[in-house]
Amino acid sequence: MELFGHTKDVIRANYFYLMERMCPSKISDAHDIPIIINNYNRLTMLKKLIDSLTSRGYTNIVILDNQSTYPPLLEWYAKCEFEVIRLPKNYGFKALWKYAPVRKRFCSDYYIYTDPDVQLSPECPADVIERMFHILKC
């Protein structure tokens, strides 16, 4: 089994190497990577996540809304400085892949996909996304 696990890692590394050569990323800076937040009726956690991201300098934030009905959230969306994409129905956690317009827009390059209840730990390095981006680009 150890050999198979290693083989998967080699295949994965070769896949990313070849993809970068055949379809090079248009993204040259980690701060340009879109951070897509899948949301449904969550305001408090969404604001905390966005505050955490913006405090680290990330502003390319897109919110996928799964037909939320919570009035305070809808009011906040109206004033929100980030792009909010109101989906035609609730696609659940797979919204990015199930709704073709957003899949086509974001899935051809680097992106980060999360829910609002995933929070960055205070111990998390401020440059964690830059570190991951550097590893992917190597």
Where in this protein do the model-derived segments appear?
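Acidic donor-binding segment of Leloir-type glycosyltransferases
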Residues: S52-K89
